[in-house]
Amino acid sequence: MKVKVERTTITKKTTTTKPKPDEEDNNDDNSSSNGVEVTATATATRETSDQLDFLPADLSATISTTTTPTATRATTTRNLILHPFDGMQSAPTLTTPTLTPTTLRSIDEAFYELTGETNNSVNAPFQAGFKPPPLALLPNSGPVVGIGSAVEAIVPAGNTLEIGHQPNLDVLSKLNYSNSIVGSDTDDSNASWNDQHRINGDTTDTSSGATDSTSYQNNSMLGNGSNGSGANNFTGALAANQSTGGRGANNNSNTNTSNSATPAARRGGGRRPNKAFNMTPEEEEKRRIRRERNKAAAARCRKRRVDQTNDLTEEVDALVKKGDTLKAEITTLTELRNQLKYVIEAHLPTCPKVRDDILSVSTCNGLIGPAALHSTGGSSCGSVHSNHSHNNNNNNNNSNDSSSGTITGFDATLNSTGRSHSPLDLKPVHIDENLLLAIKHEPLDNGLDSESSSLDQDGPPPAKRAVPLPTIAQLTASLTTPTNPNGGSLNTPIVSQAPVSFAAFAANANNPNSPTLNLLNKGPKARPNTLAVQRPFAAPMQLNASGTGGVVDGKGAPIQIQGVPIQTPSTGVFNFDSLMDGGTGLTPVSGPLIPNCSSQNKHPLELPTPTTEPSKLCPL
């Protein structure tokens, strides 16, 4: 890392002198060419020089090596010209330290090269790459503050650092870079911890590897070849520190420079020591009892967990065995079923019993009867049919279609007999024409049959069919009876039946021997897919030439359809309630309605009911 610094310094000549070290060659590698170069003059002049500066700009003094035997102190503000920094995380600021482990290692290597270029015998112990143990400084030397802590480091003017042209091992002992540059904070904190806990003498297993370096340094200063009885042996280090006396105190004060400034380090986690000094025997006894109880509880918990695991394992094994047994049984039953199925299929073509059952089928109402009915023959079906043809029951829901050959319902007696004697399902077969005579007819109400009415099956429910229909004479009289002076209008009595065709009434009146619907339904009839709607008037209405209706060829006689006089347009009003109840709707609710503009009301719902005015229903 190269830092170009233009600095104007005012130097003062002092009485302290320094030998001139060898200057570093500029052709060396950039990683090891980070040195300190300061140009000073013996007089009060100003000079501008380029050098490498590793200290922040706000420091008041710096350690410098000059070309003259004088030690200089910077008294003026330095102007820093910062160039790109290689290997640094960020640019140096007033709060960010500019010294990184890389720069510290470079400084260390630079001093090694300066002190070990010409003397290979001195540099031989450092070929392994480790730092030598710290040695004591010269007496009357000021405190050397580690550069790694990024604080001010001042070399007093009254102290001399003798650095000869031929460097030797004393340079390392005087500068003490190995202890002040690298790892000073960790060692100082551990040393302070040792000083504070020297009285207790309590050793735990939570010591880190950094504490070993402190014991190693203490043993090295004392010249001991062994590190104690163990890797983490604080006892030997503490005993060595206590036995040294004043020399050990000086060593601690010189090497661990940040002892007073560093607070006591907190111990980490881990178990507490087995024996505490501030515990009473009662507390120790309580602790021992509590630990015994905890151990017993933990043992019981482990035993219970093991027992539960064993029980579950045994249960799982039993269930697995049971599952295997069931699978084997299922396999055996499946094979047996396949064998029986094969035997039945092989025996079916040659079985005479099955052939007789198929040929001698006893049917009743288009259904295949069970085998139990074979003994009774067709008489049972005939008796059942005869009984049901004269009784009114709920057999209408069990109606079936004979022509299609499908089963839509079962007779109660037949169904119960089939369930009790026939284990096989009843299947539909093709019905022969000879079996149509045995089909049960759907009975109608006795009242309707006695009156010989011709109501269609698609009419209202049977409860409303019990009311007899009016005759042709009654209907004609009601149509021709006038209800007001304006003329004849429709005056049909209210009935709760469906409207009947006039043509059917006329035909039935002329031919009393005409067959009814029950007689017409004797033969087979296919179920219709659509609903047949018949017009109420068989013949079309005849209109006069003027289109007004009511008069044909200038005559005043009304139009007659099948003998029923009809006026066109009709002056009657169809009753909506009668239509909804299943009636004809021909009963007028009031006199004839003559629509005009004055009688129309835009809000018919606001009319009071009943009213004397003509009804506001729209005429058809």
UniProtKB/Swiss-Prot annotation:
Residues 312-340 are annotated as: Leucine-zipper. Keywords: Activator, DNA-binding, Nucleus, Phosphoprotein, Transcription, Transcription regulation. Gene3D superfamilies: 1.20.5.170. Residues 286-305 are annotated as: Basic motif. GO terms for biological process: embryo development ending in birth or egg hatching. The modification Phosphoserine is found at residue 422. Residues 201-233, 249-266, 377-405 have a biased composition (Low complexity). SUPFAM superfamilies: Leucine zipper domain. It holds the Pfam family bZIP_1. It is found in: Nucleus. Residues 184-194 have a biased composition (Polar residues). Residues 284-347 form the bZIP domain. One of its GO terms (molecular function) is DNA binding. InterPro entries: AP-1, bZIP, bZIP_sf. One of its GO terms (cellular component) is nucleus. Residues 1-36, 184-288, 375-414, 447-466, 590-620 are annotated as: Disordered. Homodimer. Heterodimer with Jra. The kay-Jra heterodimer binds more stably to the AP-1 site than either of the two proteins alone. Developmentally regulated transcription factor AP-1 binds and recognizes the enhancer DNA sequence: 5'-TGA[CG]TCA-3'. May play a role in the function or determination of a particular subset of cells in the developing embryo. It is able to carry out its function either independently of or in conjunction with Jra. PANTHER family: ACTIVATING TRANSCRIPTION FACTOR 3-RELATED, FOS TRANSCRIPTION FACTOR-RELATED. Belongs to the bZIP family. Fos subfamily. This is Transcription factor kayak. The lineage of its organism: Eukaryota, Metazoa, Ecdysozoa, Arthropoda, Hexapoda. The gene is kay.
